[in-house]
Amino acid sequence: MQNAATVLNVLRERGRRSLPCTELYRQLFNPSLYELAWGRIYANHGAMTPGADGETGDGMSLAKAGRIIDALRYERYRLQPAKRVYIPKKSGKLRPLGLPSWSDKLVGEVIRLLLEAYYEPQFSGRSHGFRPGRGCHTALREVEDVWSGTTWFIEGDISDCFGSLDHEIMVRILAEKIHDNRFLRLVRNMLKAGYLEDWQYHQTLSGCPQGGVVSPILSNIYLDRLDKFAETVLIPEYTRGRVRKMNPDYAKVTAAIGKACRQGDRAAARQLRAQRRGIPRGDVRDPRYRRLRYVRYADDRVPRTRLEVAM
């Protein structure tokens, strides 16, 4: 079998070329992916918290991974309900968190690695939430570098982003690129595994659990539709004009600089140039010119997604 790096590189290339995946489920039989997944989970100490069955990663071995692979090979693997706990938020309220069993966490991390490798090259450059090498700081850098001359800012907060995800829509979106019914069934079963609260079983009719390793990448795949809508519909529809007309104040100071230069008054020209540096060259109120900017990001500490639109 190919090693994990080769498998993920092939998926990245297919994603970059927007080619469909037809045998993604077979990659779940690759032991090297489980070794990589176990290392990723082990590096995140919070991810080692046991789920409802009390299982931990301490007893992880190639033999145990082999048993998981055999169960997946014959579609006998059964995902367990997540253990629901509550953690405090800054507001004083409690946020529900789903803790999957350790085996489910391992399988979930392998699925996450495969999905991230394939979909990451296809995501919008305006998306900064739950992505490698991206976050709030890269979103702010984009705003600082690109959004000059902005007059209005509109901020939107998609509350309960993970909890409101529609399972059927999610699977349909995946099915557009992933032509592998076994893989899609596994994702559907993962979404519908339910949770235990006070040892009572509850169904999950919508959403993916906060605390699940696959939840961030699934939410990005889901919300990529919103990003593409903003890029292909909203931004072209709102865009008007090629360049702003010159700011009257900027033009006035520029004319004064020219006059001072003609009169040989270097000190006045130098002072006027310094003054002009604080004046926008373009007229921000030009009605024949407008642009719409869009960025989406997420708070890694509080799993919620935010949108910024500038005009």
Residue ranges: model-predicted function:
Residues 1-311:
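Non-catalytic terminal/accessory segments
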